[in-house]
């Protein structure tokens, strides 16, 4: 589960960068 956290943060960062 912890290994998914960096991926989630990266996805959120990508979405935030898109907006």
UniProtKB/Swiss-Prot annotation:
GO cellular component: extracellular region
Compartment(s): Secreted
Coiled coil: none
Predominant location: secreted
Keywords: Amidation, Amphibian defense peptide, Antimicrobial, Secreted
Residues found modified as Phenylalanine amide: 19
Domain of life of the source: Eukaryota
GO biological process: defense response
Tissues where this protein is expressed: Expressed by the skin glands.
Function: Has antimicrobial activity.
Protein family: Belongs to the frog skin active peptide (FSAP) family. Phylloseptin subfamily.
Name of protein: Phylloseptin-J2
Species: Phasmahyla jandaia
């Amino acid at each position: 589960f912890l290994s998914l956290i960096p991926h989630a943060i990266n996805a959120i960062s990508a979405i935030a960068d898109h907006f």
